[in-house]
């Protein structure tokens, strides 16, 4: 009897890596819009009259619906019930609608004046669009995580997650580096957002191609992981919330990402105010961070796949994060080259923790509850991503305004950077607790992912 060499489509390297390329591109388009406003902060203040508190309020909108309306957790439940294809397509549509609202608010076509819910109408409408987009991109993120587990389990899962994160970081790098030149060339702050809208539509098309391949996986011979609609059970959430390892991962996630993503929202402004970098070039230094992760996240993911040491990798990443923000806090070497070196180190730290953190979740939580588990982690993360930018904006406006003699708004970033340093210290403490819990429970975080 002839033995079948490949029982499932996911056993084909070409097929599973093609799937990764398709869904990673979809996420890249989402992450371009996520950070496209960061380099525009000075232009928003000068041309549209925004202040740091309004900018922080707008940035905090990313997690409004996810956190306060529990949309992300609902999305995770839908993911586990309806499957990756339905949830992914719905997420792409939400991203496009949210981006469209945000573009309208920032464009010249927006004519609403006065206030809306106590904020400038333009700020509030842009924030609502960003909040809707946030539901889409975060739900897409957990969907793609489950897709990778589905196609790469027992194979190169951490490497695949690392490459997906690297592609997402490429989107961040593009947002930070090309946004201001693009806006300047077209003489419109809204032009980069329109570009993002077009990219998101292309991302929807690539996800549709993935859906065709995923259906073929279900139909392939011996496919024992066919997606089926499952009824939601309360005990699925109880399995997750009663796991100490899950909560340690979730806390590490919110602390680590709160020290990175909100920092990136203000990093361009930091380069202008502390390191005297030209505003048109200032976004290039923070862009080093995602470019570094593009190379290093897959490297560390591959290391985790083959050698293990996931908990240790997360500890080292948190330790480096503390050092980076401490150097940004101290009033030393206010030169662009020093900021560049420190940003490179931050890129290494930002590669270490996610490359081990996300592939560790399937070792703690059963696969059938992964969608809900990832959603709950992202929900906790979104609390930080919502509150921290608003906190930093308020600190800047309240305590950090300085007179630099030019007549333009300027800020002293010492206090905000001290806050980010504090997040890093707490992240290291949680990473130590996670390693201890792994030894006690035997999750296998220090073991390789590739079987055999």
Report the location of each language-model feature.
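Cytoplasmic helix-loop-helix junction between adjacent transmembrane helices
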Residues: 123, 129-167
């Amino acid at each position: 009897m002839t033995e079948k060499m490949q029982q499932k489509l996911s056993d084909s390297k070409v097929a599973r890596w093609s799937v990764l390329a398709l869904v990673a591109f979809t996420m890249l388009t989402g992450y371009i819009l996520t950070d496209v406003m960061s380099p525009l902060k000075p232009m928003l203040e000068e041309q549209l009259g925004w202040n740091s508190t309004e900018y922080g309020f707008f940035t905090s909108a990313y997690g409004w619906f996810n956190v306060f309306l529990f949309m992300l957790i609902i999305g995770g439940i839908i993911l586990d019930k309806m499957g990756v294809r339905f949830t992914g397509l719905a997420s792409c549509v939400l991203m496009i609608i949210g981006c469209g609202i945000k573009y309208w608010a920032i464009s010249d076509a927006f004519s609403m004046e006065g206030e809306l819910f106590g904020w400038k109408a333009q700020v509030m409408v842009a924030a609502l669009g960003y909040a809707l987009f946030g539901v889409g991109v975060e739900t897409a993120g957990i969907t793609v995580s489950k897709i990778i587990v589905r196609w790469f389990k027992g194979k190169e899962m951490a490497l695949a997650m690392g490459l997906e994160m690297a592609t997402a970081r490429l989107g961040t790098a593009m947002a930070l580096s090309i946004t201001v030149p693009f806006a300047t060339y077209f003489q419109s702050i809204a032009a980069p957002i329109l570009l993002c809208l077009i990219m998101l539509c292309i991302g929807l098309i690539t996800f549709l191609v993935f859906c065709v391949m995923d259906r073929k996986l279900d139909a392939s011979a011996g496919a024992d992981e066919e997606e089926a609609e499952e009824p939601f059970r309360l005990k699925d959430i109880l399995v997750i919330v009663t796991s100490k390892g899950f909560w340690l991962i979730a806390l590490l996630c919110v602390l680590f990402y709160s020290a990175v993503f909100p920092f990136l929202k203000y990093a361009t402004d930091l380069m202008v105010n502390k390191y005297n970098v030209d505003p048109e070039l200032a976004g290039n230094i923070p862009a080093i961070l995602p470019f570094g992760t593009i190379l290093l996240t897959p490297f560390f993911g591959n290391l985790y796949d083959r050698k293990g040491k996931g908990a240790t990798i997360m500890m080292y990443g948190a330790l480096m994060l503390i050092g980076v923000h401490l150097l940004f806090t101290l009033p030393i070497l206010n030169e662009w080259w020093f900021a560049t070196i420190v940003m490179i180190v931050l890129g290494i730290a930002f590669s270490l923790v996610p490359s081990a953190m996300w592939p560790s979740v399937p070792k703690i939580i059963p696969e059938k509850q992964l969608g809900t588990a990832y959603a709950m982690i992202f929900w906790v993360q979104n609390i930080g991503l919502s509150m921290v930018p608003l906190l930093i904006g308020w600190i800047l406006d309240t305590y950090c305004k300085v007179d630099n003699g030019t007549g333009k708004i300027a800020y002293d970033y010492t206090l905000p950077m001290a806050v980010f340093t504090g997040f890093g210290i707490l992240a290291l403490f949680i990473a130590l607790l996670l390693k201890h819990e792994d030894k006690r429970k035997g999750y296998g975080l220090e073991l390789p992912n590739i079987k055999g």
